[in-house]
Each structure stands twice: as C-alpha cells, then as structure tokens.
Amino acid sequence: LGAFDLSMDHRYVAWSMDTAGDERYTLRIRDLATGDELDDRLDEISNAGVAWSRDGEWLYYVTPDPQERPSTVWRHRIGTPRVDDVRVFDETDERFFVSVGTTRSEDWTVIHTASRTSSETLHVAADRPTDDATVVLERRPDVEYGIDHWGDSFVMHTNDDAVDFRLLVAAADDDWTQPDAWTELVAHEAGRRILGADAFAGHLVIHEWYRAQPRMRILFRDRTERIVDLGAEPHDVEPSANPQWDTELLRFTVQSLTMPTTLFDEHVTTGERTLLRRVPTPNVDLDDYVAERVWATAGDGTAVPVDVVRHVDTPIDASAPGVLYGYGAYEMSLPPWFSVARLSLLDRGYVWALAHPRGGGELGRQWYLDGKLLAKTNTFDDTIACAEHLVASGIVDANRLAVRGGSAGGLLVGACMTRRPDLFCSVVAEVPFVDIVSTMSDPTLPLTVTEWEAWGDPREEPYATYMLGYSPYDNTVPADYPAVYATAGLNDPRVSVHEPAK
C-alpha cells in the first residue's frame, strides 16, 4: 500500500498499491458512501504523495521518468479520462526527486523537489486548484528548505546559513516569495539537527536529533517551549499522523531496545500523557533485558555511539556471541527499535548492538558530511572501531561476532569484511550495494545521477581512485573470509538483483 488519502470532505479515499515490488503503483479512488471504486485508474505512478483540492474534485499525483525518478506532478479531475490530466510541474534535473502533499491546515498544496544537497518548494491554494504553482524561493546550490502553513504565517525549515538547520517565519499576507520576508524563529545550534516542524493552530512540534537521540520540542506562539521527556535510555520517537489542525493533543509512538512500540497521547501544554496501546509481548518479562549506550573510539579519535542490549543474565566476560548492525549513509539517523525476534537471540545469550557511524545523521549534519564522498571510509572505520570496542570491553566473544546491514548498509558490511575479515565470524548482507563503481558509472540506472552527490562520480577523479579503494567487489582477494549470507530483491529498483549476486 502506498497512498491512502481522504478527500477533505471525506467523500473519497485515494489509495495506491504495488503488487510486484518494483515501486510502480496503481492509484484508485473509492467512494466511501457506496464502497465502490470509481472508474478512475492511474497506473505507473510514483509513491511520492497525493493531494486533494478543497472541493474534492481534483487530485494531484506524481509519475516517474524512465529511470524511475519521481519527476512530474499532474492534476487529475475526478471522473475524467487520464488523457485530460494537466501537467503541473516537471522536474528536468535528474538529481531532483519530486513529491506532493497538503499542509495540515488543508489550505495549501505543496510541491517539493529535492536533490541530496538542495531543494525548492512550490505552492497552490487548495481552493484554487487550477492556478499555476508558484515557487516559494528559487533553488540555490547547497541550500535546502521546506515550508508549512501556520495560520497567519508560514514556517520555513532551512539550512541556509545553518548547517544543522533553523526555522524562519513569514507573515501569510506578506510576499513570502521574497527572501527578506522571512525572519528567524528558531536559531541554529551546532549539533542539534532540526529535521522539520509540524504546524498546528497554536503550536509547532519540532523534530530533531540532539546528542544522538531523537526528540520532540513543542514551541508555542508566545515563543515559550517544552521538550517531550522520554528518559535517557536510547529510544525512538515518531509522531503519528496527527491530522487535526486545532488540537492540544500530540499522538506519538515510542520504542526502545527493551520497550515495545507504545502509543501515547500527550497534552502539549500540561505534559499529561495517556498510554493508548502497547504492542503485546505475551510470556515476556521485559525486565529481563538491559540496554545501554557505549562509545567506541575511531582511529582519528572520534567518539562513536553504540547501543547495546542483552539479557540481564548474560555476563560481560568476553563469552557472549554478538551481532553488530549498521547503516551509516544518506544522513539517515538510525534509532534503536524493539524486535520480538531479537528476544530469542538475547534469551540464548547473544548481545545485539547498533552502531552509529559517520555517514548517518545522529550527531548532526557534520556527522553525515564526515562520512560521504571523499570521507566515506570513515563509515567503515567507525564500524570496525565499534566492533573492536565490543570485543575489548568484554561485551562479546572475539571469535563470535557477526555484522549485519542492508542496501547501503550492505556496502558497509562488505567493506568491513574486506578490510577486517579477521574481526567477524559471519556477515549478513541484505540487498547489499557492493559494486559501487560499476553502478555509479552508469547514469541510465535508477538513482545513479542523484546519488553522485552522496558518493561521487567514479567517471572522474579523485572519486574513481577513492571509490575503487573501498568498493567491496573490487577489494575481494584470496583470503579467509567469514561466512556470508546475502539476499537480493528480484524486482528491487534500488539495488538490482545482479549486484548482491556478485
């Protein structure tokens, strides 16, 4: 299931599905009064959002280019043939991916186009769907931004003059397509990575990573604020849909290595919290497990966080088998998550650890920048340092440590294996991206062009030499490698099936 969006009058729901796993979706529209599907059928669309007009007569959607890049926004009138659909926006720069959505206030349709390093936003009033889309601020190199509607104002989330992002505000009745219409609302703070802000009638909910932990901060219109307190144990927190514009309740989920996904409502002003539901774990005593954060030291002296969970009866005496998981790419911050299946390992004396190497975003944008392009090997060195720390501190048995990762995390575990085959007894590589030089040299493949900003273009120096120096496929030599379990997706549009096979 991809899209699932109600029209504003709750007459229709637009929903899409992918039945082959190739991320090519078919969109249908259901009449909620009758339960019947309308004749409207939109095949071969992207899972990049949909947006309704206020009257429920028009629907915006996105289609891909031949490389499967979401590139074009269309406007479809309900009940009319697709051939009559209107092209609203077409992104010709192959580095940019397009999405469409609606502000929580339901007053604006927002089109967002973004590369790995810059972005641009366009808007259309939801009650004037046939108007042309207007650019908020023209795109600039290395500047990212997005907007949300906040009643009498608009809020912008941007890295302009702020590596870890800041928030700006502009009056709704001002010409906010001009840069000088925007004033600072939340200042930049190095190391506090602001991911975005959800606007509600009376407050903003700011989502950020701070000291390698995700958190939510509530900012009221009088500029006072409150942090949602979730304790010190490494955890994940995710907002729910929270579709209601004028509300004082915030719904979110929390989970950790020792706590199942738990749904809460919290009053934004008082902080009063109500537990709504926790994923049941029958016959499990959660007090049997303990989690902690430890810090490894990389070769250049950088401290790297590692989250560790074990059974309380598992001794720290270098006897426990262990699994180390990592990703470390695309500024993706990887919070700890709960897994019932993992409990089976922990009950049998295993230790499970989650590395946060450079290349992710856990410690701010600079943490990501220090693990991409010509600094990519920091990601592998950090993960190796995490493994060495687990061994040296007696948390795991030196001869029984496995490493696991998928996609770009498959590149990570492949590089760790070829660099330090002695450190791991086994490797789990899920849809691994291991032949990076060949893949990134072919601009006809899905994602390649936009990924040059993350990895570099191996058709040029110094990237060719640097990438060949760490590519797992190009650095496999006769050696005593650990056992490898590799998986592939037959129709995977990101990592083609032949790459894990290599």
Annotate the PLM regions.
Residues G322, L346-H356:
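A fold-wide structural signal in alpha/beta-hydrolase
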Residues V13-W15, L59, T109, F154-M156, ...:
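Hydrophobic beta-strand positions that form the internal "hydrophobic ladder"
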Residues D31-G35, R77-P81, A125-P129, A171-D174, ...:
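Short loop/turn segments that connect beta-strands within beta-propeller blades
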